[in-house]
Each structure stands twice: as C-alpha cells, then as structure tokens.
C-alpha cells in the first residue's frame, strides 16, 4: 500500500488534534487525584484499562460514527458545526484556566469503575474527542485512511498511558505552573482546530443552499 507524505501529514494532524483536545499532560493531576487511594499495581491496572477502553471507544467512533449520524438523520455538516463549537468551548476553558479546575470536580473514589467512567469516558474519549474523530472519518474515508487514523488513535492512547504511568515524576518536574502553561498552549491549538471545523461546516451548508 502506497502512502504519500501528504497522507502521513493527515494522520499526524489527527494525532496532534487528539493530543491537543484531551491534553494528556494536563490530565496528569486529575489521574493522580483519582488514583491516590490505589496501590501501585492497582494504579497500573487502572491506567491500562482506561486507555484501552478509550482506544476502543474512539475506534468505534471512527468506523461507525458516520452510520450513527445517518441513523439519526443528522447531516455531517451540522455535526461539523456542533463539533467545532464544542471544541472551541473546550479550548476556551483550557486557555482561561478553567479546564483542569472543572474536571477535578468529577473526582470519584469508587475503585471499581473509575478506569472506564470517568477516566476513559468522558475524560479521555470525551464528546470533543469523539466528535473530532467522527468528523475526521468523513473527511478521509478510504480503508488506508481508516488504517492510518486507527494507528494515530493507538499512538494517542499509548501517549496517554505513558503520561499517566509517569504521573508522579511529571508532576514533580513540571509543577502546577508548567502544566498550566502546556494546557494553555494545547488550548490555542484546539481553538484553531475548532474554528477550522466550524468554518468548513458553514461553508458547506451555504454552498448547498446556493445550489
């Protein structure tokens, strides 16, 4: 299978957009807070299950998301606009410093299922990541594109796993200020992505109305 450098840039952009949307480094304090009652082995298991679950959720969104939209009679352009607005709102909360604070309120001490809820969903594979994945699947819908995007999702889940695995060290090295700076940078990248989704959706709808 021949994949051009342009194709690689598409998958890299998708991978970067997921990282910017979820901000794994910014999630480290949340993961640490939620698992501080667990032993080292329990924390490792929680990390693995959470990221594997998020990987499966995003894969389902990639392969079946468009069919789900069609079943509900939702046009992809409407979904692009909704997804763009959602991503912009998340980006704004990240830039303004409210993102981490809001997520901390979802802290749960329930040992049994925090790996799936709320870690895998909605914190890792949340509405923003799911909507972004569905929109991406409509842009690039060949099997080679699905394979490339699947690899990007796997690498994203692996990066999240690495960040959570190294959580104690990262918190100690970066500190609260460093994590806040990274969160704001990710927010700017995310804002640009949301505006791109929004503008493409609006242009497509107006173009259809004019014709």
Swiss-Prot record:
Pfam families: MarC (PF01914). It is found in: Cell membrane. InterPro entries: Multi_antbiot-R_MarC (IPR002771). Keywords: Cell membrane, Membrane, Transmembrane, Transmembrane helix. The chain crosses the membrane at residues 14-34, 54-74, 76-96, 116-136, 144-164, 185-205. It is a multi-pass membrane protein. Its main location: membrane. Belongs to the UPF0056 (MarC) family. This is UPF0056 membrane protein BUsg_257. It comes from Buchnera aphidicola subsp. Schizaphis graminum (strain Sg). The lineage of its organism: Bacteria, Pseudomonadati, Pseudomonadota, Gammaproteobacteria, Enterobacterales.
């Amino acid at each position: 299978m021949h994949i051009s450098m342009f194709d690689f840039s598409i998958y890299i952009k998708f991978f970067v957009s997921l990282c910017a949307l979820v901000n794994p480094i910014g999630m480290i304090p949340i993961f640490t807070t939620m698992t501080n009652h667990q032993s080292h082995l329990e924390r490792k298991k929680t990390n693995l299950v959470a990221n594997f679950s998020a990987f499966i959720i995003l894969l389902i969104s990639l392969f079946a998301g468009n069919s789900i939209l069609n079943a509900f009679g939702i046009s992809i352009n409407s979904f692009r606009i909704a997804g763009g607005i959602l991503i912009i709102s998340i980006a704004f909360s990240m830039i303004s410093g409210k993102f981490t604070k809001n997520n901390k309120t979802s802290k749960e001490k329930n040992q049994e299922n925090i790996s799936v809820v709320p870690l895998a969903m909605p914190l890792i594979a949340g509405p923003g990541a799911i909507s972004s994945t569905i929109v991406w699947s409509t842009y690039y819908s060949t099997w080679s594109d699905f394979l490339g995007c699947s690899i990007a999702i796997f690498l994203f889940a692996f990066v999240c796993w690495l960040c959570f695995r190294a959580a104690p060290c990262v918190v100690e090295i970066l500190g609260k200020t460093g994590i806040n700076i990274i969160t704001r940078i990710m927010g700017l990248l995310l804002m640009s992505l949301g505006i791109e989704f929004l503008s493409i959706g609006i242009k497509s709808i107006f173009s259809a109305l004019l014709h």
